[in-house]
């Protein structure tokens, strides 16, 4: 089966919107053992859409079309598909009724423009979208099935999981057994990870993939076939051992998710006092439902005055050592923990750049501390001088990893290949 994707929309084509839908779809398909062979992005021009539908349908078996199903004049996917096949649009009475019911339930009057979303090509098969007003559909043109989905990410994801994947599995008899193991890493470059993994002799049916999503690099271990799937846990365990401290989570999208899972199941509590990370530590945890059970408070103490008045940092500590220092960040962590007697508190203070660095403390210098009931762990690291956002996100990741290691009763301070550390 040859799978392709067509993404529509001027805002996507011009770069005004980053096409996260395409990245998610490709990754999701890969996790099911299905590889996308081609992706095309087209603007909101009827003739261009018609041309690409006709041309790509000669080469692909299945094409997922994303976007262009809304009620406005620049939503042209249904019209373009009808013209590409030489047929008219007709109203789908079932979807019109769904639209009317949706607006009634939400105590809103349905705009006339929304009726456009019930207009489908004559030969179209309706594809259910239970979470939105855009009607999905599929049409056979030349050798390909074109499967139309809305551009709203939540709606796309629902339709792909509930409609698209079952359809292609049935249509093309895709019964191959596939399993996937993910290892999340921090502090090591992709090439450094590959240098350790590539010499390993992998069993037949097992392959390795890498995905960089800073501050993480995700290692995907694919197993295809029953024999390979049976060997997957052993292979993943061996790779994890080879990579050592680089691996910080298994089958989690982010290190924040790993911390959320462990705190949620531990009954322990966390507070944070953030300077250079500016709320990243707490914000990423709040993304997960249930975080209120362990996250007591998060303070952004950016100024020296706030460090003194809110956290109780000694002014003499700031005068003698500066805001970006181990003594200061240790007092920040202790102060944050003491406010509500949390089990743990994380604190960060650093120079994210692009300016503000000195010879002794260049941009990328970050002090991080973890306060516990029995003491304080701290380190001052030197991060690669890249973007301000990367310095901040890497700082949050290292802070999370310190907490993760404490929760696992492991050494809290460890070496990372691409992160330096100042001596105390």
Swiss-Prot record:
Enzyme class: hydrolase
One example GO MF annotation: nicotinamide-nucleotide amidase activity
Pfam families: CinA, MoCF_biosynth
pH-dependence annotation: Optimum pH is 5.5-9.0.
KW Hydrolase (keyword) present: yes
Keywords: Hydrolase, Pyridine nucleotide biosynthesis
Name listed for the protein in its UniProt record: Nicotinamide-nucleotide amidohydrolase PncC
């Amino acid at each position: 089966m040859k799978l392709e994707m067509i993404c529509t929309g001027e805002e996507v084509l011009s770069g005004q919107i980053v096409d996260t839908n395409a990245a998610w779809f490709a990754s999701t398909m890969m996790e099911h053992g299905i590889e996308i062979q081609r992706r095309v992005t087209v603007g909101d021009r009827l003739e261009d859409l018609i041309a690409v539908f006709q041309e790509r349908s000669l080469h692909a078996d299945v094409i997922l079309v994303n976007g262009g199903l809304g009620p406005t004049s620049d939503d042209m996917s249904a019209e373009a598909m009808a013209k590409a096949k030489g047929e008219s649009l007709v109203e789908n009475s079932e979807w019109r009724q769904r639209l009317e019911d949706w607006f009634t339930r939400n105590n809103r009057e349905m705009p006339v423009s929304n009726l456009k979303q019930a207009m489908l090509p004559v030969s179209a098969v309706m594809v259910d979208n239970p979470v939105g007003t855009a009607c999905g559909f599929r049409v056979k043109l030349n050798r390909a099935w074109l499967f139309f989905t809305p551009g709203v990410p939540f709606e796309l994801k629902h339709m792909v999981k509930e409609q698209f994947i079952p359809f292609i599995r049935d249509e093309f008899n895709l019964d191959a057994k596939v399993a996937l193991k993910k290892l999340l890493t921090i502090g090591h470059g992709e090439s450094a990870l590959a240098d350790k993994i590539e010499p390993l002799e992998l069993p037949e049916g097992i392959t390795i993939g890498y995905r960089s999503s800073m501050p993480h690099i995700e290692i995907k271990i694919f197993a295809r076939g029953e024999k390979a799937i049976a060997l997957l846990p052993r292979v993943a365990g061996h790779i994890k051992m080879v990579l050592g401290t680089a691996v910080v989570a298994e089958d989690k999208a982010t290190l924040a998710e790993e911390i959320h899972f462990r705190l949620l199941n531990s009954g322990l509590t966390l507070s944070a006092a953030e300077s250079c990370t500016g709320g990243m530590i707490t914000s990423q945890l709040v993304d997960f439902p249930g975080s209120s059970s362990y996250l007591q408070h998060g303070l952004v103490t950016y100024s020296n005055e706030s460090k003194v008045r809110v956290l109780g940092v000694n002014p003499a500590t700031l005068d003698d050592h500066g805001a970006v220092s181990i003594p200061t960040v240790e007092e920040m962590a202790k102060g944050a923990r003491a406010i509500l007697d949390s089990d743990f508190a994380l604190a960060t203070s650093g120079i994210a750049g692009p300016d503000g660095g000195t010879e002794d403390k260049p941009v990328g210098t970050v002090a991080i501390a973890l306060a516990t009931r029995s003491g304080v762990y701290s380190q001052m690291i030197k991060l690669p001088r890249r973007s301000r956002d990367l310095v901040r996100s890497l700082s949050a990741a290292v802070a999370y990893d310190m907490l993760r290691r404490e929760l696992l009763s492991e050494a809290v301070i460890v070496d990372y290949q691409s992160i330096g550390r100042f001596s105390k």
